[in-house]
Amino acid sequence: MYSTTILLVQPETSSGVYLRTRLETKGYTVVEAPDTTTAMNIVNGSEIALVVTELYLRTGKSRCLARTIGQSPALRRTKVLAYTKHGKREDRAWARRIGADGYVITRSGEDRFLEVVDDLMETPSTPRRGRSSDATTE
């Protein structure tokens, strides 16, 4: 069965509550994690289709969360969306190198965020990593 569960990784904020509400309204199940340790515990123990995270959010050994997920054989079908304030060309290149499947700059707005989430959730998951979807925006 195809999972419709999205893990939203960010500290509790009003924008996080708003994004969760918008995602749930669209029919997605949303799980939240306030930090990377909690996020990795959830991802390792649940069927998560998509992880939404800040591009440079670090895990315990100072490794990028997106890269950690992308390099795990058990999680290589889990998609990662970098939802970030960083919009430089080198940030996008970094996201592609570490295996982010999509990239949205926060100032693009929630509607664009939801479009990219829908695109990623509709695209069949493949076990390949180190790629980035065309679902990117400024």
Language-model regions, residue ranges each:
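His-Asp phosphorelay/catalytic-motif detector in bacterial-type signaling
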Residues: 3, 47-49, 74-79
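Two-component/phosphorelay signaling modules centered on CheY-like receiver
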Residues: 13-31
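CheY-like receiver
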Residues: 124-138
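Alpha4 helix (beta4-alpha4-beta5 surface) of REC/receiver domains from two-component response regulators
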Residues: 64, 86-104, 112-115
